[in-house]
Amino acid sequence: MTKQFAVIGNPIEQSRSPELHHAFAEKTGVDLNYQKRLAPLDGFESSMRSFFAEGGSGMNVTVPFKEQAFALCDVLTERAQIAKAVNTLWMENGKLHGDNTDGQGLVAAIQALEWNLENTTILILGAGGATRGVIYPLVQAGTQKIVIANRTLARAEQLVDDLKTAVPQAQLQAISLNDLEGDFDIVINATSASLSGDALQLPEKLQFKYAYEMAYGKPSSFLDQAKQRNVPYSEGFGMLVGQAIEAFYIWNGVRPQLKDFL
């Protein structure tokens, strides 16, 4: 019997999840159908529950519903608890289970680029949900120190406070975006600033070996600056594929190889 999956969000037209999951299915021999599902901004829960009531096997959640999905789950993985957001849902024994595969997607993408994560110092620009979701998997992969830089320093400090007990083995630090300096192995852009006209300037006193932009398919002043410095860089398509692979594995018990889809 064909398993039914969906991605839910608002807007949803831009999602590449159906294309990815159908490609994974073709490669692994899993019989599935994967659809986009547009939910009204005030209608996430009813849309999600009706999908599972109709026999749906699993659902991905995208903006703006990840925090709502987190709040509705009966059972959460450790990384979802730390992220306080869920992008992968499934039903088991009548209970709604939730996970967050975004951070694992980022780790898989960085490893596929053969950038080392062991004992690294990483700078993340931005202190929003995207950053919260990747800290724990980065530390699990061996990152030693993570500095979170945000325009509003208090927000970065709050995030560090929230997360330091979850990742006691790593050093977390908050700084203002106005105080960017020092040497880092990897800089990760988790802000939308480089996608809008509000371009982020990386000062000369900030040095780094690699640059990763979480967004993909759009012009990025962050990556333009990495190119000017001749620093190896990547945009976020690998992270998108990586998080989708992790969700596919949770649902179907088989893990496609990231390199086959980049």
UniProtKB/Swiss-Prot annotation:
Pfam families: SDH_C, Shikimate_DH, Shikimate_dh_N. Involved in the biosynthesis of the chorismate, which leads to the biosynthesis of aromatic amino acids. Catalyzes the reversible NADPH linked reduction of 3-dehydroshikimate (DHSA) to yield shikimate (SA). NADP(+) binds at E78, G126, A127, G128, G129, A130, N150, R151, T152, L153, A154, R155, M214, G236. GO terms for biological process: amino acid biosynthetic process; aromatic amino acid family biosynthetic process; chorismate biosynthetic process; shikimate metabolic process. Gene3D superfamilies: Leucine Dehydrogenase, chain A, domain 1, NAD(P)-binding Rossmann-like Domain. HAMAP family: Shikimate_DH_AroE. The lineage of its organism: Bacteria, Pseudomonadati, Pseudomonadota, Gammaproteobacteria, Moraxellales. Keywords: Amino-acid biosynthesis, Aromatic amino acid biosynthesis, NADP, Oxidoreductase. This is Shikimate dehydrogenase (NADP(+)). It comes from Acinetobacter baumannii (strain ATCC 17978 / DSM 105126 / CIP 53.77 / LMG 1025 / NCDC KC755 / 5377). It catalyses: shikimate + NADP(+) = 3-dehydroshikimate + NADPH + H(+).
